[in-house]
């Protein structure tokens, strides 16, 4: 559901992440859920990362590999957190 809180979180991600967090591209940027919504992933900002269209497709081609890598990246950025907080 895209309520006011979710819009604010997405806006923050867009404002803070001006480039793909994998390759550095500034073209065709999208927001990716590290824990997919189909896995119960929520819109916690630690579960969201900005990727270009090409990297977004790459990440979706090998979920497990990239999920682990992106979670490690988020732990570096945000410090330690319980990954259960990223799921509903």
Can you say where each PLM-predicted feature lies in the sequence?
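Charge-rich, low-complexity amphipathic helices
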Residues: 31, 53, 57, 73-81
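Short, charged surface segments at domain edges that flank catalytic/cofactor-binding sites
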Residues: 1-19, 40-42, 69-72, 77-87
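Histidine-centered nuclease catalytic patch
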Residues: 21-50
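Short Cys/His-centered divalent metal-binding micro-motifs
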Residues: 28, 48-69
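Intrinsic structural disorder/low-complexity segments
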Residues: 35-36, 59, 63, 77
């Amino acid at each position: 559901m895209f309520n006011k809180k979710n819009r604010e979180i997405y806006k923050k991600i867009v404002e803070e992440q001006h480039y793909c967090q994998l390759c550095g591209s500034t073209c065709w940027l999208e927001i990716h859920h590290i824990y997919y919504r189909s896995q119960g992933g929520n819109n916690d900002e630690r579960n969201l990362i900005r990727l270009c269209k090409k990297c977004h497709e790459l990440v979706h081609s090998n979920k497990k590999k990239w999920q682990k890598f992106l979670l490690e990246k988020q732990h570096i950025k945000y410090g330690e957190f319980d990954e259960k907080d990223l799921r509903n």
